[in-house]
Amino acid sequence: MSRAALDKDPRDVASMFDGVARRYDLTNTVLSLGQDRYWRRATRSALRIGPGDKVLDLAAGTAVSSVELAKSGAWCVAADFSVGMLAAGHERRVCKVAGDATRLPFADDVFDAVTISFGLRNVVDFSAALREMARVTRPGGRLVVCEFSTPVSALFATVYKEYLMRALPRVARAVSSNPEAYVYLAESIRAWPDQAALAQQMSRAGWSAVRWRNLTGGIVALHAGYKPQPV
């Protein structure tokens, strides 16, 4: 899979992530210039979780994000459809489950909070995934989506686009076990909805009071919403 198939085949995407699993965390830290750690902390803060809460970390990859969430004292489940990614994080002591975001292997209303970081872009039907996340979240529970987005400054957006399409693939060739996967990354980011459009998609999927906060000038956005209480 050398280019971004924007009508993504789930098997291709899972295979691609299996192939980059071994050096995934290192590559992300290098390509983000260390911002990935800040984004994980911001996600944990936005979830507003604490001891006793049950949290689903969807598209958790190697579970590095799940470990950050667990610092709150919450009980965290790391779920991903790439078995290779979960295996690469075997030393991280959180519960791990292989599963498809559009058909989650959990009962209704079981989690106090759900989050997905840099994974919603990779789901073939991300609206279905948003509905599934609502299904497994208890009424009043919270969703936080951490995802690449649209820089707020036109000048910054131009510089960022150049980084994505020119510099990022070159850096990936130096540090990644599968640099072609990062061509997919760049193209999928360019094709992704902006902040307002994603907020609309979340609302249509059943989430209420959807708001977003830009991080790193809008390179990343945190979208948060609640599952409504039954009337």
From Swiss-Prot:
Would the keyword Calcium turn up in this protein's UniProt record? no
EC number annotated for this UniProt entry: 2.1.1.163
Catalytically driven reaction(s): a 2-demethylmenaquinol + S-adenosyl-L-methionine = a menaquinol + S-adenosyl-L-homocysteine + H(+)
* Any Gene Ontology biological process: methylation
Which PANTHER family does the protein's record reference?
Answer: 2-METHOXY-6-POLYPRENYL-1,4-BENZOQUINOL METHYLASE, MITOCHONDRIAL (PTHR43591:SF24), METHYLTRANSFERASE (PTHR43591)
Family indicated by similarity: Belongs to the class I-like SAM-binding methyltransferase superfamily. MenG/UbiE family.
Q: State the protein's name.
A: Demethylmenaquinone methyltransferase
Native species of this protein? Mycobacterium ulcerans (strain Agy99)
